Amino acid sequence: TPNDMARVKNTGHNRAINRHQWNAEDLSVALNNQRSPHANCLSALKALIAIRQQQPAFHPNATQYTLNCGRSVFGFWRQSQDRRQSIFCLYNVTRTVTHVALASLNLVGNNTWSDLISGSSVDLDGDDPMLTFEPYQAIWLANLTL
């Protein structure tokens, strides 16, 4: 939803900028228009939820640790309860392209790693393999995909 400047003005609260209040009919129209940003956002969120539901490392009781990936990337590592699946959840929180050295993640080299979101594989070969992030891109790097 775009910034709701009228709501900020009416309430006097800056946080109201992202607190748009929908009526049911307008929301239904927006979500049923497949070309609307609202329908696209909902579709993308549903796809991410479907991916998460299939991955044991996203179980609520799975192990989780935050990672130090520098100032541009927020990350955390999750491991399934049976320890078979690891997922590195990495988020570029900037509006610029950024890179993370795969060596900094301590990936197990004998596993095949792929991004659950894009479906692309990650090549661990080379002298200094890197992950490249587009602005605000998320990568869920997993050793076992289901």
Model-found features: residue ranges?
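A residue-level signal for conserved active-site and pocket-lining positions in enzyme catalytic cores
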Residues: 48, 113, 136
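Conserved active-site loop/cleft motifs that coordinate metal ions or position small ligands
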Residues: 88-91, 115, 141-142
